[in-house]
């Protein structure tokens, strides 16, 4: 029984995902339904957490919009997520960057990772 579930989950995994790590700046394009219309909405932010669980993998993006911190959790293999683009690679030494929630301005900056 579990082999059937694993096979079904394997078929639903997205194959064309870029590799990204915490600290990277991503642009995620998501399908949004407004009434009868369907359009793409872009969300650009810094990866502060990644949860690797196969089909149930997720990542959290954080951005500051009009002085307010906005965090959004995306399911990596969701059909709602249209595309993921890496805009900038960040050099950090932690897996979870929750400390960025308390920081603002220059202290919230992340150095760029070079040569990678």
UniProtKB/Swiss-Prot annotation:
List the protein's name: Large ribosomal subunit protein bL19
* PROSITE patterns per the UniProt record, alphabetical: RIBOSOMAL_L19
Origin species, per record, is Pasteurella multocida (strain Pm70)
Q: Name one GO biological process term.
A: translation
| Swiss-Prot/TrEMBL keywords | Ribonucleoprotein, Ribosomal protein
Give the UniProt entry's GO cellular component terms: cytosolic large ribosomal subunit
Family membership noted in the UniProt record: Belongs to the bacterial ribosomal protein bL19 family.
Q: Does the keyword Ribonucleoprotein apply?
A: yes
Which domain of life does the UniProt lineage start with? Answer: Bacteria
What's one GO MF term for it? structural constituent of ribosome
UniProt xrefs under Pfam families: Ribosomal_L19 (PF01245)
**Protein purpose:** This protein is located at the 30S-50S ribosomal subunit interface and may play a role in the structure and function of the aminoacyl-tRNA binding site.
């Amino acid at each position: 029984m579990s082999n059937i579930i694993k096979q079904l989950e394997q078929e639903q995994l997205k194959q064309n995902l870029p590799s990204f790590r915490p600290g990277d700046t991503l642009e995620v394009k998501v399908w949004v339904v407004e009434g009868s219309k369907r359009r793409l909405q872009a969300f650009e932010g810094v990866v502060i957490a990644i949860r690797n669980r196969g089909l149930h993998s997720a990542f959290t993006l954080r951005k500051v919009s009009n002085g307010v911190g906005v965090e959004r959790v995306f399911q990596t293999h969701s059909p709602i997520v249209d595309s993921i683009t890496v805009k900038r690679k960040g050099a950090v030494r932690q897996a979870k960057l929750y400390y960025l929630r308390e920081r603002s301005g220059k202290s919230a900056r992340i150095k760029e990772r070079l040569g990678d």
